[in-house]
Amino acid sequence: MNIHEYQAKEIFREYGVPVPRGEVAFTGPEAREVAQRLGGDLWVVKAQIHAGGRGKAGGVKLARSLDEVEKIAEEMLGMTLVTHQTGPEGKKVEKVYVEEGADIQKEYYLGMVLDRSSEMPVMMASTEGGMEIEEVAAKTPEKIIKVAIDPTIGFQGFHGRKLAFGLGLAKEEIRPFIQFAEALYKVYMDKDANLIEINPLIKTGDGRFLALDAKMGFDDNALYKHPDIHEMRDLSEEDPVEVEAAKYGLSYVNLDGNVGCMVNGAGLAMATMDIIKHEGGEPANFLDVGGGANPDTVAKGFELILSDENVKSIFVNIFGGIVRCDRIANGILQATQQVEVNVPVVVRLDGTNAEEAAQILKNANIKNIIPATDLADGARKAVAAAKGEL
């Protein structure tokens, strides 16, 4: 689960991570009132969406008067912001964050992620603040300093010193930087985050470090421990189909292809997408019906897949272990009664009650259901059907 910048900064403040003063606003007049409360003669108005690259897309602007704050906010609110992370459809701006201006002397990058290879949280820093960190990693990976932090000992001074020396900080800057990094580590661990990014982390004219931007993502499986974080969830920023799928215990991720996929098990689902691409097709989604699949969830899965107008065929690939194939077959029949299944459906069922399932589908005599003998055969047929060649 992701949250907005203003929400991440609220959490930072709780833990003593320095951030500029600011407040969220939902209208132009509200933005003006926020700027008036903050005082000063320079403010930043930031569109609040769950995506990076806002500055380049016109979602971050400076204002030098209260009138300008209100005008910029009114222009941003309601606009659709398209960045490299939103996709071509973009995201609608429903709130803005008004923040006091800062005296920026130097920009850095500071972040934390879970590194699966070392099986530890890793803190990363770079002198290339303000740039896309993925671009830095691809072109100049030597400019990213990393420290793996063993949770059994936590963040130590030597972790901070390695990062500080790598950034080339002056002697008097090292201690405040280490204090900043230590507070950030505590946020990450206490809140069960799986991502924190501060880009940029700035050094001000008076030598302070401030989180000028803030991005946080959380482990969904740990949200039950953090009702305060769960309340920050903004469903309007999430794919509505994915939200609907989660209500039924389905793991769904929308993709750009035209071959719909319904599979049990994440590993088999990824293998299915791989072989579809190998056969010259493009998967339209990732859909794992899980081990508790029943006719109702299968029917719902079809409804979700068919809500994508790009889908030209569906590949149902089930290996029955915990999931019984006859339940999947009955779910397919139920789906044809509840939803207009107007595309070819290639079905490969193997494992528990597979023969019974095959008989159920055969007796139903539904013309657009195409049986497949194995994974490769199913992928070939699904790709061919999507191309209108079957």
Curated annotation (Swiss-Prot):
Family (UniProt): Belongs to the succinate/malate CoA ligase beta subunit family.
Cofactor remark: Binds 1 Mg(2+) ion per subunit.
Residues engaged in binding ATP: K46, G53, R54, G55, E99, A102, E107
Catalyzed reactions: succinate + ATP + CoA = succinyl-CoA + ADP + phosphate; GTP + succinate + CoA = succinyl-CoA + GDP + phosphate
GO molecular function: ATP binding; magnesium ion binding; succinate-CoA ligase (ADP-forming) activity; succinate-CoA ligase (GDP-forming) activity
The keyword Cytoplasm belongs to this UniProt entry's keyword annotation: no
GO cellular component, one term: succinate-CoA ligase complex
Listed pathway(s): Carbohydrate metabolism; tricarboxylic acid cycle; succinate from succinyl-CoA (ligase route): step 1/1
Residues reported in the UniProt entry to bind substrate: N264, G321, I322, V323
InterPro entries: ATP-grasp, ATP-grasp_succ-CoA_synth-type, ATP_grasp_subdomain_1, Succ-CoA_synthase_bsu_CS, SUCC_ACL_C, Succ_CoA_ligase-like_bsu, Succinyl-CoA_synth-like
Signal peptide: none
Keywords attached to this entry: ATP-binding, Ligase, Magnesium, Metal-binding, Nucleotide-binding, Tricarboxylic acid cycle
Lineage: Bacteria, Pseudomonadati, Campylobacterota, Epsilonproteobacteria, Nautiliales
EC identifiers of the protein: 6.2.1.5
Name the UniProt record assigns to this protein: Succinate--CoA ligase [ADP-forming] subunit beta
Enzyme class: ligase
General function of this protein: Succinyl-CoA synthetase functions in the citric acid cycle (TCA), coupling the hydrolysis of succinyl-CoA to the synthesis of either ATP or GTP and thus represents the only step of substrate-level phosphorylation in the TCA. The beta subunit provides nucleotide specificity of the enzyme and binds the substrate succinate, while the binding sites for coenzyme A and phosphate are found in the alpha subunit.
Cofactor(s) it depends on: Mg(2+)
Species of the source: Nitratiruptor sp. (strain SB155-2)
Subunit structure, interactors included: Heterotetramer of two alpha and two beta subunits.
Binding site for Mg(2+): N199, D213
Superkingdom of this protein's organism: Bacteria
One BP annotation, GO: tricarboxylic acid cycle
The ATP-grasp domain, residue ranges: 9-244
